[in-house]
């Protein structure tokens, strides 16, 4: 298939990645002459030189420049951002879809690096490391007894492909320290978490972000499901803050017919660039459902909007974030970068889904809180839409612009999470910590159990629910969970499944009673 080469990766992250939303990137270098017209830069340069040469105390002019750049960009829009060198490397790595490391999922548990699960067939698994092992030393570097931030830990464990590192670990089951030599290798950072069957002839694919490898991962998952005879597909974009625009476009192309419009952009000078679908999509006729929520942004909204506006997909969930700006990146010699908004993107019917930002960045991000206060997350009729931003699809369906994708089928937040207490538990990650500690205390209780046997074991007793209630009390949380016992039990079981069997099994458990998935399946009856 051919993708419009004018669209480069959107590296977004709607408040999920770096505490800011990084927007759609277009592939066009910013030439020095484009900046020549900005005569004010002379004033800035003179000021920096004056401070550097004459200020009474020693001062780091680099930090002043960074603050200046930050301040300038913050006055433009919420998505024009400065990215310092350390964060730029992290973003690039995440969106690349892989890195070189030892292949473990871990927690900083109390004062040590605790392995949740080695990556299957990864370097650590091959070397013999196991779930529950504590990494004490990486070479001669001590990794326990202090709180190292995750990025510092990663830097100790990463390296050149093929390089070897000796790890000293404490294995609780044997009550002794062990040494392992681990050869670093390329570790995939999956953007497609799961592809599985969720009903008769219905497949499900979860995309957590749009990275360089997303389209390839998606095609692999879709092909696997098609071999199982799917007639309908659910694409889960909940909490997907975006990613590479061209990857979202490529996914959309699999569902649309030749020459159907996917997305278009408009720049300051009025230039319009359109991207159309090509013939030969692998799922042009089956039913498609897209799950979204208030954290689905940018590239996710491009995909959802393309399918909704072409009457090709049914959107299920809650109004999406509302991120419709396109950025161009300018790199600096120190490894930092600026992403500047240079265009807006529009869905096929011509709507911009960018929410207003004229009142400043603080009000812009506060809008998410306003949705809770207005009741929008609980009732469809609380969604504010303007008649002036009303559009029609080819089949006459009314869709709205001005702030996110409005779903065709609304699913309130309490249908998913029961109440605010449960939603809070999921945000804190406390369920994962509880499960890790339970397994750490008695991993043998699950030893040798096949997955179906595990499910029977978890359903036969409410032991872990009661233990969890005590656990959260000990952490200082006084949350009433009795009314949502079944829901909390499902999350506990799903987390046990993840840590014991892997990510796919988490979804196998959690999707069985998922409110949005159930809404889709009820439509098909």
Which role fits each region the language model picked out?
Residues 132-134:
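Structural motif
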Residues 299, 311, 318, 322-389:
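Polar, glycine-rich mid-to-C-terminal structural blocks
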Residues 28-40, 44, 48, 52, ...:
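Cleft-lining beta-strand/loop regions that shape enzyme active-site pockets
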Residues 9-25:
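Hydrophobic membrane-insertion alpha-helices, especially the h-region
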Residues 138-139, 170, 341, 356, ...:
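Residue-level recognition of conserved beta-strand edge/terminus positions
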Residues 78-114:
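PDZ/PDZ-like peptide-tail recognition elements
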Residues 352-353, 357-525:
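Conserved functional hotspot residues or short segments at active or partner-binding sites
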Residues 59-88:
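N-terminal, post-signal-peptide region of Sec/Tat-exported proteins
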């Amino acid at each position: 298939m051919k993708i419009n080469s004018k669209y480069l990766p959107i590296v977004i992250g709607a408040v999920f990645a770096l505490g800011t939303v990084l927007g759609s990137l277009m592939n066009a270098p910013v030439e020095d002459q484009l900046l020549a017209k900005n005569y004010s830069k002379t004033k800035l340069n003179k000021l920096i030189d004056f401070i550097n040469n004459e200020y009474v105390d020693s001062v780091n002019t680099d930090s002043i420049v960074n603050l200046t750049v930050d301040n300038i960009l913050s006055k433009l829009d919420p998505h024009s951002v400065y990215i310092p060198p350390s964060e730029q490397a992290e973003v690039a790595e995440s969106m690349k879809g892989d890195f070189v490391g030892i292949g473990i999922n871990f927690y900083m548990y109390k004062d040590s690096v605790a392995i949740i699960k080695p990556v299957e067939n990864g370097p650590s698994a091959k070397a013999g490391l196991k779930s529950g092992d504590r990494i004490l030393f990486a070479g001669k570097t001590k990794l326990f007894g202090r709180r190292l931030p995750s990025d510092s830990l990663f830097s100790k464990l990463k390296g050149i492909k093929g390089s070897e590192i000796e790890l000293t670990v404490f294995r609780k089951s044997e009550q002794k320290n062990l040494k392992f030599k681990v050869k670093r290798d390329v570790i995939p950072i999956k953007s497609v978490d799961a592809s599985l069957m969720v009903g008769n002839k219905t497949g499900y694919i979860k995309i957590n972000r749009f990275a360089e490898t997303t389209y390839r991962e998606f095609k692999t998952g879709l092909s696997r499901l098609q071999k199982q005879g799917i007639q309908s597909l659910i694409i889960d974009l909940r909490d997907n803050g975006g990613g590479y625009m061209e990857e979202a476009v490529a996914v959309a192309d699999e569902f649309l017919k030749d020459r159907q419009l996917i997305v278009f952009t408009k720049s300051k000078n009025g230039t319009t660039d359109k991207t159309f679908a090509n013939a030969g999509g692998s799922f042009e006729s089956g039913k498609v459902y897209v799950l979204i929520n208030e954290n689905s942004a940018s590239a996710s909204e491009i995909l959802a909007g393309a399918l909704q506006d072409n009457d090709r997909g049914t959107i299920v969930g809650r109004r999406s974030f509302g991120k419709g700006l396109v950025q161009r990146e300018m790199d600096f010699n120190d490894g930092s970068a600026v992403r500047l908004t240079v265009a807006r993107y529009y869905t096929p019917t011509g709507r911009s889904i960018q929410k207003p930002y004229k009142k400043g960045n603080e009000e812009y991000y506060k809008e998410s809180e306003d949705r809770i206060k207005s009741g929008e997350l609980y009732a469809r009729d609380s969604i504010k839409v303007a008649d002036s931003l009303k559009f029609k699809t080819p089949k006459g369906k009314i869709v709205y612009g001005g702030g996110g994708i409005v779903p065709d089928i609304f699913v309130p937040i309490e249908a998913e999470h029961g109440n605010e207490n449960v939603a809070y538990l999921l945000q804190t990650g406390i369920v994962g910590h509880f499960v890790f500690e339970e397994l750490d205390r008695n991993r043998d209780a699950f030893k040798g159990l096949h997955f179906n046997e595990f499910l029977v074991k978890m359903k036969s007793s409410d032991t872990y629910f009661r233990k969890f209630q005590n656990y959260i009390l000990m952490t200082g949380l006084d949350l009433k969970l009795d009314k949502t016992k079944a829901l909390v039990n499902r999350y506990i079981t799903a987390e046990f499944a993840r840590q014991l069997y892997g990510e796919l099994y988490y979804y196998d458990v959690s999707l069985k009673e998922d409110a949005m998935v159930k809404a889709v399946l009820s439509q098909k009856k």
